[in-house]
Design a protein with these regions (language model features):
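Exposed loop and linker-edge segments at protein-protein interfaces
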Residues: 337, 374-375
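Acidic, low-complexity mobile loops and tails
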Residues: 307-361, 367
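Non-catalytic positions within long, well-ordered alpha-helices that form the structural scaffold/packing
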Residues: 75, 251-257
Length: 396
């Protein structure tokens, strides 16, 4: 059984995207993502320095766009049994599992990053990594100082978060046997200090159309697999102000019988945690395109052959529905709204729904074949109305 994972904030390093621009289609995907994110992700991923990409409002869109671009080069989430993301990486995992489109993921991460940055600026807060020590002792010390265990990543890796003054007191009175390392982040993410960001993200999420995952999709709140797109979206919103339990995600991977893990770029953090928590499980940190062949080999070796739901097999067909009411417009220069048999790549635009306030794009979360259009260019459509039937395909 194979799982694809997407890392969270802090994994980015200067220039990590540069080699990926040589892969056909990646620059175009990143260019489109940049428009949705409102910033030049190609520049931030290639020539920007560490301070620039540390900015929460930049780092979060950069991470999601990078993971999705690499997934597209790998042929998408169709080649996995399960998906999981750490913190903001959950948005990329949702796309791989077919819950939402890449465009909607970029719209959400733009709001998420900006809202979390604004919440962090409201009060002087921060985060400190706690390495080693007895877990119960560490958690008791964190609570004693009024802090929150914002990330419990694995045995011996917990991140405390809260007010700067409380973190200073914690540093002066550390748990026995533990080492403390202050993190260079803007604020106390995944704590109550992020409540304003939850409200902003909830408003943005109300505009997103979701479908149920066709992969086993793990969530950070408790490591559990979600079965509906609605539940996943609710969890994604709440997670901004709730601790990340990656340790429980790792436990679920073990319970599921995961035999291989591929981490999307900027890779290394999650495979490092898995190496200690899941000994014997094959891991590949996909850092450069040179590793794509090895990743495909790992997929071929470990992909489950089960025919049950949630085992990574593509659904027979899916409906793409209107995200809002308005007028449907087919994409100029690609194929008209009556065409069938057209093959579209992961995240390719299928058209737009135009409203008085703007337009919403349609995209498929999978590489797919157009089976049947249910509307024509210029038709009025209602929110939730089926627009097109598609057959997900591998390797489009």
């Amino acid at each position: 059984m194979l799982i694809i994972t997407a890392p969270g904030q802090g994994a980015q390093t200067p220039g990590f995207l540069a080699p990926w621009l040589e892969v056909p289609g990646v620059a175009e995907r990143l260019g489109a993502a940049s428009e949705l994110a409102g910033c030049d992700l190609i520049r931030y991923g290639t020539t920007a320095d560490a301070d620039e990409i540390r900015d929460t409002a930049i780092a979060q869109p950069l991470l999601v766009a990078a993971a999705l671009a690499a997934a597209g080069a790998l042929a998408g989430g169709a080649h996995a049994d399960a998906a999981a993301g750490h913190s903001v990486g959950e948005l990329a995992a949702g796309v791989l599992a077919g819950v939402l489109s890449a465009d909607d993921a970029m719209r959400l991460v733009r709001v998420r990053g900006a809202a979390m940055a604004a919440a962090a600026a409201a009060e002087p807060t921060g985060m400190t990594a706690v390495l080693g020590g007895d877990e119960e002792t560490v958690l008791a010390a964190i609570a004693r100082h009024g802090l929150t265990p914002a990330n419990i990543n694995a045995a011996g890796q917990i991140v405390a978060a809260g007010a700067i003054a409380d973190l200073a007191a914690f540093a002066a009175d550390p748990p026995a046997g533990a080492r403390l390392r202050p993190l260079q982040v803007a604020g106390a993410f995944h704590t109550r200090y992020m409540a304003p960001a939850v409200a902003a993200l909830r408003d943005a999420a109300a505009e997103v159309a979701v479908t149920d995952p066709y992969l086993t999709l793990l969530c950070n709140a408790d490591g559990a697999a979600v079965t509906t797109g609605k539940e996943w979206l609710e969890r994604i919103v709440a997670q901004v102000a709730a601790p990340v339990r990656w340790d429980l995600c790792l436990r679920t991977m073990a319970d599921l019988g995961v035999t291989a893990i591929i981490e999307l770029p900027p890779a290394g953090t999650l495979t490092g945690l898995a190496r200690r928590a899941l000994p014997g499980v094959a891991q590949l940190a996909l850092k450069t395109p040179d590793q794509l062949a090895a990743a495909r080999d790992l997929i071929e070796e470990h992909l489950s052959e089960s025919d049950g739901p949630g085992h990574g097999h593509l659904p027979e067909w899916r409906l793409i529905v209107a995200p809002t009411s308005g007028t449907f417009r087919s994409p100029a220069g690609r194929f008209d709204a009556t065409a069938t048999g057209a093959m579209v790549a992961l995240t390719s635009e299928l058209g737009t729904v135009v409203t008085r306030g703007g337009e919403r794009s349609l995209a498929t979360p999978w590489p797919a074949e157009i089976i049947e259009w249910l509307v024509e260019d210029g038709d009025p459509v209602s929110e939730g109305q089926p627009l097109v039937r598609v057959q997900p395909r591998e390797g489009v």
